[in-house]
């Protein structure tokens, strides 16, 4: 172990001075290094928390459609290009914007074989309108599935463009969409899951 040549205390360097002896000799005080804060910043915590809520909502919808025999393909940016989320943080470009806007899923109806883009959103308020959609959203034929603490509702990008919206009192439930022809009892089961997961959010 290296010792100070003056006082014998621990030092980093063999045949060197410890910090106290060095400061006395040079009549200066080494700057106090501010201890770095450990853990996530508040901004990073919020980002990660919202990401987790979104992923839970996506998983609920994925499992709901899978349980009804749908072919479900994860399509969003984090699935098509793994690791891209971190790379695009703070990047402002047309390409980055297009990648961020990719819908979460491509789903195929087992009966009709129709294919749909599906974007999943969690909203504690249970509300969604055109102002919640990115400007110039390129997937005009996509369905927006909104998972809230109480309901699972659905609206198309086209309907949002016509001024329609999802509110706490609207009746645009996922089970009412004729395009999907879903079992309402299964949807109710998944609504109960949503209540369990998002009850305290």
Which residues does each PLM region occupy?
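Cys/His-rich microdomains that often coordinate metals
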Residues: 8-12, 25
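Catalytic cores of nucleic-acid endonucleases
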Residues: 68, 112-172
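Catalytic phosphate/metal-binding cores of nucleic-acid and nucleotide-processing enzymes, i.e., regions
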Residues: 49-57, 64, 91, 100-103, ...
